């Protein structure tokens, strides 16, 4: 969609936003919502008349490392969030991805964008997603009404369900201002164990066996030989299963020794090399130079081999897997055919979700970038949208047509 003209409306707080939303309702207009616009490529192109800019919603409000809570405004840049947490040797456990290389954006964006898209990295497999760490928030709905959910205490579960609903809604239900997140201490150390495998099925099975052991891995990925080479790793097998262990030094060393003894061909990466490798996996840097579109596909790990085999029969593609095989990152040809084939393969292998992340051509004009909804789920989404935003003011159509 090419916009000829629109007004950029800068707001500094929720009272300003309420006035803008009230005016939009009166004029029967739609508003786009953005801060740094680093995730503007995700989802559909919203149908808006004017754009409300919330980048002024920025700054750390309260950080209590001893209580494991961080309160800040949603427009706070991620580099500021990360430096604040690093000052107390803490982190966001869901491991925020920085997709600026594949999205051709200037930075990792804001914490609000992270929450709006529920962006979660490799540790999601064991630690949960972004929505699981949002303790509370202050926001304004598409009705122009301010509301609060949750609180600032880790034990306080009030509002968690609403946090889970608003996270991942792409700004279609409400605009965040103040948010409170649960933080965690950084692990003392981390290492990675590399296990060569003959094929994808063997890699998935190997990882499943390790996760069934008492050795507490917290992340697992699978790299084909050519992708591993991009990360500077020479692989003897067709696939490389990667296991990450984190914790205190003595525990990590003991667990690694047991796993290496049980899997004779395993190789250990030290902490620095392990950290660098998982950053490349988290940020999808390993596909940044690939031609065509990039898709993110969520499925059952056991379904991954059949899905990849089906796609390789028809397309020239590159891929790797995160979340023990449950998250496939794929680079393939632009256009509708690749995405359609992916969704057909998903449907034939237990279902899942395929999302277009990088559109290198005009694929968004030809195929829905987010997984299409069943009629029942579409009706449910419509009802939720009507409850928060009955006039469809906020980011109308950003996720699904007509919502």
Regions found by a protein language model. Name each.
Residues 45-48, 262, 266-403:
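Conserved glycine-rich FAD pyrophosphate-binding loop
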Residues 1-40, 268, 349-372:
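N-terminal accessory segments
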Residues 35, 75, 243, 330:
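Residue-level signal for inorganic ion chemistry
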Residues 40-46, 232-234:
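Short glycine-biased active-site loop of nucleotidyltransferases that positions the nucleotide triphosphate
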Residues 6-9, 29-32, 49-52, 68-70, ...:
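Structural motif
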Residues 79-81, 200-205, 249-257, 303-310, ...:
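Short, conserved charged micro-motifs
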Residues 116, 135-291:
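C-terminal substrate-binding/cap subdomain adjacent to the FAD-binding core in PCMH-type
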Residues 2-33, 54-107, 115, 119-152, ...:
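N-terminal glycine-rich flavin-associated loop
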């Amino acid at each position: 969609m090419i916009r000829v003209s629109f007004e950029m409306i800068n707001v500094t707080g929720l009272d300003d936003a309420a006035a803008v939303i009230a005016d939009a309702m009166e004029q029967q207009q739609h508003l786009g919502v953005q801060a740094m616009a680093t995730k503007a490529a995700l989802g559909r192109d919203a149908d808006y008349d004017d754009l409300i800019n919330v980048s002024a919603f920025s700054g750390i409000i309260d950080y209590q490392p001893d209580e494991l809570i961080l309160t800040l405004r949603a427009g706070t840049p991620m580099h500021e969030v990360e430096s604040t947490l690093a000052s107390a040797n803490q982190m966001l456990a869901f491991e925020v991805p920085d997709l600026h290389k594949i999205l051709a954006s200037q930075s990792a964006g804001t914490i609000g964008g992270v929450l709006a898209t529920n962006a979660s990295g490799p540790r999601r497999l064991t630690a949960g997603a972004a929505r699981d760490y949002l303790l509370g928030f202050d926001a304004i709905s598409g009705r122009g009404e301010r509301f609060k959910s949750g609180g600032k205490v880790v034990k306080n579960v009030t509002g968690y369900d609403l946090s889970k609903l608003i996270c991942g809604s792409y700004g279609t239900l409400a605009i965040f201002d103040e948010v409170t997140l649960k933080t965690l201490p950084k692990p003392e150390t981390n290492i990675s164990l590399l296990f060569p495998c003959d094929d994808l099925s063997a890699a998935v099975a190997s990882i499943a066996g390790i996760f069934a052991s008492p050795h507490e891995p917290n992340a697992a990925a699978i790299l084909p030989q050519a992708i591993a080479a991009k990360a500077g790793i020479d692989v003897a097998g067709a696939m490389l299963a990667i296991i990450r262990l984190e914790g205190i030094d003595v525990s990590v060393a003991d667990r690694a020794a047991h796993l290496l003894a049980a899997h004779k061909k395993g190789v250990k990466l030290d902490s620095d090399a392990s950290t660098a490798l998982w950053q490349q996996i988290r940020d999808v840097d390993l596909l940044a130079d690939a031609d065509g579109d990039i898709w993110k596909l969520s499925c059952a790990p056991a379904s991954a081999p059949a899905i990849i085999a089906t796609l390789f029969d028809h397309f020239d593609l590159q891929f790797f897997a995160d979340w023990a095989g449950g998250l496939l990152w794929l680079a393939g040809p632009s256009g509708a055919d690749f995405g359609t084939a992916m969704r057909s393969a998903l449907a034939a292998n237990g279902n899942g979700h395929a999302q277009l992340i990088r559109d290198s051509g005009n694929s968004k004009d030809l195929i829905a970038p987010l997984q299409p909804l069943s009629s029942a789920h579409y009706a449910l989404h419509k009802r939720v949208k009507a409850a928060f935003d009955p006039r469809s003011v906020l980011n109308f159509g950003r996720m699904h047509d007509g919502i």
